[in-house]
């Protein structure tokens, strides 16, 4: 969504009225919407939007063939509630540059990641909720410090809530030994044992 807004604001004519996306902090958001005010030519804005929409459909034709970018016009005047053009650019900067995705890998597997789960504007303030994940408590803490540094650097206030528990590899596991032996007895070969970066409930069950 932020890339869409940046594209449409190439002439600095866009002002953000409101933005909303996602409903869970640990889920990659599938939909988002923004209400904007343009101070430029409406017909030209529509043309630029169509060009941008076609570009993104080409870019994500294989990865997301069902992608939809919809533009709806409204006759309601919301000039008074719109964020300034510089403020709109700042929101776009924050959403496009905030740490996101895989942050650290080891032995071919992901060990540290985060996602932007929810975002919304309320009373001209931007609220973003991120889900942090790490295989160890230290990895989660480092990630929290990094995100906090970014938020403070962009004029925001970080609020670190309860984190999902980490799920470090347990090298001495009676259950793993039993499952490995059962697999070897059944198939005559040793199983490939991996630590995956997923299933947050695993950490909750351990605790």
Predicted regions and their residues:
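General "foldedness" signal
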Residues: 28-33, 63, 130, 142-146, ...
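Generic non-transmembrane alpha-helical segments
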Residues: 3-11, 48-59, 146-154, 174, ...
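Midchain, well-structured core segments that form catalytic/ion-binding scaffolds
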Residues: 1-133
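An extended, acidic, His-containing surface patch that forms the Zn2+-binding/catalytic region
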Residues: 70-115, 120-123, 137-142, 157-207
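C-terminal, non-catalytic macromolecule-binding modules
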Residues: 129-155
């Amino acid at each position: 969504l932020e890339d869409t807004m940046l594209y449409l604001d190439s002439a600095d004519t866009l002002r953000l009225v409101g933005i909303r996306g996602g409903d869970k902090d640990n889920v990659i958001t599938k939909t988002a919407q923004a209400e904007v005010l343009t101070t430029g030519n409406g017909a030209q804005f529509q043309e630029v939007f169509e060009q941008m929409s076609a570009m993104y459909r080409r870019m994500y034709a294989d990865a997301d063939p069902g992608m939809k970018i919809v533009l709806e016009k409204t006759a309601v005047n919301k000039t008074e509630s719109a964020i300034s053009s510089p403020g709109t650019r700042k929101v776009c900067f924050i959403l496009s540059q905030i740490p996101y995705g895989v942050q650290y890998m080891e032995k071919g597997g992901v060990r540290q990641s985060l996602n932007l789960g929810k975002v919304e504007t309320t009373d001209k303030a931007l609220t973003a909720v991120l889900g942090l994940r790490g295989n160890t408590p230290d990895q989660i803490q480092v990630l929290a410090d990094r995100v906090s540094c970014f938020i403070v650097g962009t004029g925001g206030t970080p609020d670190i809530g309860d984190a999902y528990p980490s799920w470090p590899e347990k090298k001495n596991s009676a259950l793993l030994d039993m499952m490995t032996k059962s697999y070897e007895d059944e198939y005559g070969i040793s199983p490939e044992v991996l630590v995956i970066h997923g299933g947050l409930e695993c950490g909750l069950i351990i605790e």
